[in-house]
Amino acid sequence: RSSVHFYDPNTFTLTPENSDGKSEWGHTAAAGKFQAGSNEEHVVSTFSKLYEKYIMNNIPVYIGEYGCVMHNNDRSNLFRNYYLEYVCRAAYMYCMPVMLWDNNVKGGGNEHHGYFNHTDGTYVNNSETLVQTMIKAATSTDANYTLDTVYNKAPK
């Protein structure tokens, strides 16, 4: 079995507040606000390579850590939600379970990966709907719920 971490592109998922940080992701992102070469096609390409090299050779792969920090504005968080749903659905389509990284840090900014309160299990950062969306994306067997349906819901 093999485990990988997935935080591509880190300028969007981990360090959006840095000088080279990015506030948007995917095919609808505005020019200059996304990391070139690290959009939906990159996710599919990366997961496809893992699938072909390992899973097709009976070596299980799971994404042992992934996530995207809470950003500091609503528009950026729309792209965050889209990214997380897309990555989870792509992982499902390529037969890889996912494990969300949660460091219990509330609020927005670099390394703010809080989804649950580690003391009482409640949701933080208004993450309940997002977490339910990620669970659906990572587990749904609905044949009509595809990467294309997620792609077509990207923020405008």
Where are these regions (language model features)?
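Extracellular glycoside hydrolase catalytic/binding regions
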Residues: 1-93
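Aromatic-rich peripheral "rim/lid" segments of glycoside hydrolase catalytic domains that contact
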Residues: 73-156
